[in-house]
Structure formats: structure tokens, C-alpha cells
């Protein structure tokens, strides 16, 4: 962690391409930015940030250098972590913890809806990952007393098209 912080501080001091201000419109800020996920087309990056004292998932458009609104994704009563995004960032899969339980959730930027994918799972879930087209979601589950891999097939109806 010290190396990452050191690299960030050096980059900020040398005024490189990284945006290193406390601005709400910059990729990086003086607050914690972690758990990055890059879209398959390389245009978007989703990550967890602690800006304004609120921990949540942000989506940044690298091409247009601006944040994308994510209505209904971040809730004040839940902690969102470990984002993974589809090819065009239409879908964001992540872990949300509320009511003392972690669930894998899927956010659709087009419909602005959140779907809980692991409701009713026994045990813990962590580290979700989504396929480029948004059809498959993998994650780790501890429901059998050890960490195992699960795959959810969402079918062919909804593909990653904006």
C-alpha cells in the first residue's frame, strides 16, 4: 500500500496526466480511490471512492473525462464494493452489504435498476466478475464451508448494448 500511495504522490507532484485534485470532477482526489475495474472497450473505469465522506461506486468516462450518474446504485444504508463492469459499462456487478449481509447485485445503467442476484444464498459471497456481454456473472461463495466459484447465466435476452 505504501508503494501505491508513494506512486500516487509522485504522480501528483510531477503534474502528470493523472487528475490529482480534490475536485468532484477528477478521476483521482485526495480521498481513497480503490478497487478499479476497466470496461472491455477501455472507455470506462468503475471504482470505490470515499469522496465527501461517503463510500460508494463511481463510474468515470475516460474518453470524455467525466463521471457518469448512477441513480439508485449507491444507497446510504449499504456498503458497495468490488465493482466489475461489462464491455460498455451498461452493467455493473458488485457486492452490497446491508442488514449485516453481503449480496451480489447487478446495476443496469439503461433501466437504472438494481437486481439482487444472491438473495437466499446461504453463506458469504465475494469478488463478483461480469462477462463482457453482461450474460455471465461469476463470484466466490462460502456456502459449502469453503470458498467455491459460482456462475450465473443471465440468458441471451439482455446483452451489453446501450
Residue ranges and their predicted role:
Residues 10-162:
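Sequence signature of WD/YWTD-type beta-propeller architectures
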Amino acid at each position: 500500500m505504501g508503494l501505491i500511495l508513494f506512486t500516487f504522490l509522485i504522480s501528483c507532484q510531477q503534474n502528470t496526466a493523472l487528475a490529482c485534485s480534490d475536485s468532484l470532477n477528477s478521476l483521482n482526489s485526495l480521498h481513497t480511490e480503490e478497487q478499479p475495474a476497466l470496461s472491455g472497450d477501455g472507455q470506462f473505469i468503475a471504482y470505490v471512492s470515499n469522496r465527501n465522506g461517503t463510500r460508494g461506486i463511481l463510474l468515470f468516462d475516460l474518453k470524455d473525462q467525466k463521471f457518469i450518474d448512477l441513480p439508485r446504485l449507491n444507497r446510504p444504508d449499504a456498503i458497495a464494493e468490488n465493482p466489475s463492469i461489462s464491455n460498455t459499462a451498461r452493467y455493473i456487478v458488485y457486492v452490497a452489504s446491508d442488514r449485516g449481509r453481503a449480496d451480489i447485485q447487478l446495476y443496469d445503467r439503461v433501466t437504472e435498476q438494481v437486481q439482487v442476484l444472491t438473495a437466499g444464498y446461504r453463506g458469504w459471497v465475494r469478488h463478483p466478475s461480469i462477462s463482457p456481454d453482461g450474460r455471465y456473472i461469476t463470484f466466490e461463495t462460502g456456502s459449502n464451508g469453503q470458498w467455491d466459484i459460482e456462475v450465473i447465466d443471465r440468458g441471451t435476452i439482455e446483452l451489453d448494448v446501450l
